[in-house]
Amino acid sequence: MTNTLDDSIGSMQNCVSIVRDTSLKLRSRAQTPEETERIKKVLQLTRKYEEVTQSEVLAAQQRQAAEIAPQVQDLIGGVEKQISSLHSKERKLKSQSELNKSRLEQFPMTRREVVDVPRDADNVVEVTEEELQELEELQREREKLKMEISRLNLEKRKSVYGKLPQ
């Protein structure tokens, strides 16, 4: 606020200086009645600039601050709401990430882990196409059950710890 006041005062002083310089130049040229009339107007303008007191400048500055302050507060409130919304979204995404991570950890990484059959050359097992399809169907069923268990665990956590953001 002080910086703005200093800038305003400096600007006003610059304007007064320019008007004074101009009036001096006009006075030196004042040789005709038309120029004399013009000089009178310039001098009146100079007096108006010089009549603005520091208290008037401060009063104008206070009026301007009072006018702008509510708008600034509204803008700050809007920004705070947006930040709150972003924090909520962040918590929601973290929760979803943790859930997906736990689900991913439950899934087998390879088919070898699913079957749990050692692949040694001495221990070769022949499987028919029907048995392979049945095994794959059982694996799919097992995955569905794991997903259901994961969902139920999440619901249980929600009921125990309160509702998590969606």
Swiss-Prot record:
Residue ranges the record marks as coiled coil: 119-160
Cell compartments where the protein resides: Nucleus; Cytoplasm, Cytoskeleton, Spindle; Chromosome, Centromere, Kinetochore
One Pfam short name: DASH_Spc19
A cellular component term, taken from the record's GO annotations: spindle microtubule
Keyword Nucleus attributed: yes
InterPro entries cross-referenced by the UniProt entry: DASH_Spc19 (IPR013251)
GO BP terms: attachment of spindle microtubules to kinetochore; cell division; mitotic sister chromatid biorientation; protein transport along microtubule to mitotic spindle pole body
Key words, A-Z: Cell cycle, Cell division, Centromere, Chromosome, Chromosome partition, Coiled coil, Cytoplasm, Cytoskeleton, Kinetochore, Microtubule, Mitosis, Nucleus
Biological function: Component of the DASH complex that connects microtubules with kinetochores and couples microtubule depolymerisation to chromosome movement; it is involved in retrieving kinetochores to the spindle poles before their re-orientation on the spindle in early mitosis and allows microtubule depolymerization to pull chromosomes apart and resist detachment during anaphase.
Subunit structure: Component of the DASH complex consisting of ASK1, DAD1, DAD2, DAD3, DAD4, DAM1, DUO1, HSK3, SPC19 and SPC34, with a stoichiometry of one copy of each subunit per complex. Multiple DASH complexes oligomerize to form a ring that encircles spindle microtubules and organizes the rod-like NDC80 complexes of the outer kinetochore. DASH complex oligomerization strengthens microtubule attachments. On cytoplasmic microtubules, DASH complexes appear to form patches instead of rings.
Assigned protein family: Belongs to the DASH complex SPC19 family.
Protein name: DASH complex subunit SPC19
Lineage: Eukaryota, Fungi, Dikarya, Ascomycota, Saccharomycotina
Gene: SPC19
